[in-house]
């Protein structure tokens, strides 16, 4: 984080690259994320820019334990894989580059801040800080309210992104998110975090 304490990541601040530099833009980004059930066990997400261009697509298991999700670019190339780590008091996911499961390809780990909470609250640990048993200091934190799957993402005290839930045909498994990504922030990282938070909190 910059030396001067601020409440929001801004133009000119250092890039926050978690997945890849190619997903960091020097300006704020407004994204629309659409989620739809594909069949009984699978659903998918599509991410669009304000012009309607497809940027990312995520598919995988909608229910169950040890879930796996895959993020791809518009051409279908795999960017990263998200895997839920079985039964635990605190939901935990590991995210690797491509289809890998290898430790050296680990991008980040996501874990619920508390075992039981009515609000969105998750911690993100980068590989050099992913031994959550030895440290309680996370690299990023996402927190939200009680009523829906809306939350904000912080690096220390600085806001780096915001996710807003919007109602759609909820009974049909369709709903959207509006995402605001601050300048120089890796939007693929923010979208992956959104999907894992949604999976943790939604069973529809």
Curated annotation (Swiss-Prot):
Q: Which domain of life is it from?
A: Eukaryota
Q: Name one Pfam family in it.
A: LOR
SUPFAM superfamilies (UniProt xref): Tubby C-terminal domain-like (SSF54518)
The UniProt entry, under Gene3D superfamilies, shows: LURP1-related
Its job: Might be related to the phospholipid scramblase and tubby-like superfamily of membrane tethered transcription factors.
Q: Which family does it belong to?
A: Belongs to the LOR family.
Q: Which PANTHER family match?
A: PROTEIN LURP-ONE-RELATED 14-RELATED, PTHR31087
The entry's protein name is: Protein LURP-one-related 14
User: Lineage in the entry?
Assistant: Eukaryota, Viridiplantae, Streptophyta, Embryophyta, Tracheophyta
């Amino acid at each position: 984080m910059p030396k001067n304490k601020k409440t929001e990541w801004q133009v000119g601040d250092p890039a926050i690259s978690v997945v890849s530099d190619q997903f960091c833009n020097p300006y704020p980004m407004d994204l629309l994320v659409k989620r739809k059930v594909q069949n009984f066990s699978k659903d998918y997400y599509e991410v669009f820019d304000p012009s309607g261009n497809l940027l990312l697509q995520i598919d995988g298991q909608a229910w169950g334990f040890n879930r796996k999700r895959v993020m791809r670019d518009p051409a279908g190339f795999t960017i990263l894989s998200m895997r839920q780590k079985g039964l635990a008091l605190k939901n935990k996911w590991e995210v690797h580059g491509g289809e890998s499961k290898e430790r050296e390809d680990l991008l980040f780990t996501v874990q619920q801040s508390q075992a039981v909470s009515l609000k969105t609250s998750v911690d993100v640990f980068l590989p050099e800080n992913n031994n959550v048993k030895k440290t309680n200091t996370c690299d990023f934190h996402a927190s939200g309210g009680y009523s829906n799957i809306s939350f904000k993402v912080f690096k220390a005290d600085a806001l780096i992104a915001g996710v807003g839930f919007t109602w759609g045909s909820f009974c049909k498994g369709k709903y959207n998110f509006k995402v605001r990504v601050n300048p120089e922030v890796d939007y693929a990282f923010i979208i992956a975090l959104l999907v894992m938070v949604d999976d943790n909190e939604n069973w529809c």
